Design a protein with these regions (language model features):
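Alpha/propeptide regions of enzymes that mature by internal proteolysis
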Residues: 20-376
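Bacterial Sec-dependent N-terminal signal peptides
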Residues: 1-21
């Protein structure tokens, strides 16, 4: 008499198992030729931590915060070399000009929605001023990026609060990073499917330095989806200018690139440009209304800039230009895979006004990739 119950339980467990999203490599998709790090995440770069706050309330609040910390110390007092590359500048990335001028980061990076940027700035200022050793600080270059999640989220309600940002900063950790419709990716849309947060990494061989490049993305853009060179968007008949795609192509993509390679700001900008090439490989087109930005930084401790240093000169031990090509390839591969992970890990969400954005249909995608002999 227990057989019907047991059978129903098995069916339920099978359905749950089938419904669980899988990352690209979990599906047999192997993008590029370089191996990933242990977690295949930006946190494979030693010292980098990620924190997220997901805000889902009632029928219309679908937003959140994602933060990336370059190291566990006082970032203002020990600034890291950094660069920003603007692929298409229809966005509101706060802190850009000082990073470009001075070549460093002095705060964590915050990602949120467009109308939450000011809140992110206030939270980063509070966070910085409250740290020991910063009692005399009177200027903070808060770096806050955004995408517009207003299709699914009541963005005008400005539901992201300082406490949400501070919570993400407080709970930031290393190890695996949650992906999909979480944090700053809770309400985003990508290629007409549910977008979100994605991450990936690449590890160079020891003979090339053994360096790690990690990428985290917040995907909210459009185009013609490609996965590992396969025209998935066309096969699904859902793409920019296609008859079946109702969602507009305009959106944004924030890309954060971390590396432990000793790079100065000039070569970090060169690295950032390669991340944009990774976006292009997924079929993104950097449309007119898209804010596509790359923030790149190095965690190398010997390249940090002490805020209180009295030394008139700095010694530079950065990599030579000739050593950059393997890192370029790593950035391209990791960015491409991070974007695909953001799609595969996101689940269907219904939000503001009853709007529903479907997840990328993983089983159909697997079938398409098999057709093109791209599954391993």
């Amino acid at each position: 008499m227990y057989k019907p119950v047991f059978t129903l339980l098995c069916i339920f467990l099978l359905q749950v198992s089938q419904a669980q999203p899988r990352r690209a490599r979990g599906m047999g998709i192997s993008i590029g030729v370089l191996p990933p790090g242990r977690f295949n995440a930006i946190t494979d770069v030693a010292g980098v931590t990620v924190g997220q706050t997901t805000i889902i309330r009632a029928d219309s609040v679908r937003t959140g915060v994602t933060v990336i910390l370059p190291h566990s110390g006082n970032i203002f007092q020990n600034k890291v070399p950094a660069a920003i590359y603007v692929g298409n500048g229809f966005g509101k990335l706060a802190g850009t000009t000082q990073v470009k001028e001075l070549g460093n980061l002095e705060t964590p990076v915050v990602l949120t929605n467009t109308l939450g940027v000011a809140t992110g700035i206030e939270a980063l200022i509070d966070y910085t001023l409250q740290q020991n050793g910063n009692e005399a600080v009177q200027s903070v270059n808060a770096v806050v990026g955004e995408t517009n999640d207003g299709y699914l989220n009541d963005i005008r309600g400005r539901h992201v609060k300082k406490s949400d940002v501070l919570l993400a900063l407080k709970t930031a950790a290393g190890g695996p990073v949650q992906e999909g419709a979480v944090g700053a990716g809770t309400g985003t849309v990508c290629f007409g499917f549910k977008g979100g947060i994605g991450t990936a990494s690449r590890k160079l061989p020891q003979k090339l330095g053994g360096y790690t490049v990690g990428v985290l993305v917040q995907t909210n853009f459009g185009g013609v989806l490609q996965i590992d060179g396969v025209p998935v968007g066309e096969e699904l008949n859902k793409y920019y200018l296609g008859d079946q795609l109702n969602n507009p192509v305009d959106g944004s993509c924030m890309m954060v690139v971390a590396t432990d390679a000793p790079l100065d700001s000039r070569n970090l900008e060169r690295l950032a440009k390669r991340a944009f090439m990774g976006l292009a490989k997924t079929g993104g087109i950097a449309s007119n209304g898209s804010g596509d930005y790359v923030i790149a930084f190095s965690t190398d401790s010997l390249l940090r800039s002490p805020h209180q240093s009295r030394e008139p000169k700095e010694s530079i031990h950065a990599l030579r230009n000739d050593e950059m090509s393997p890192l370029f390839m790593a950035a391209i591969e990791a960015t491409e895979e991070a974007i695909i992970n953001s799609l595969l890990m996101a689940q269907t969400i219904t939000g503001k006004g009853g709007r529903k954005v479907e997840a990328l249909p993983a089983e159909k995608v697997a079938g398409i990739l098999k057709k093109y002999n791209r599954l391993k």
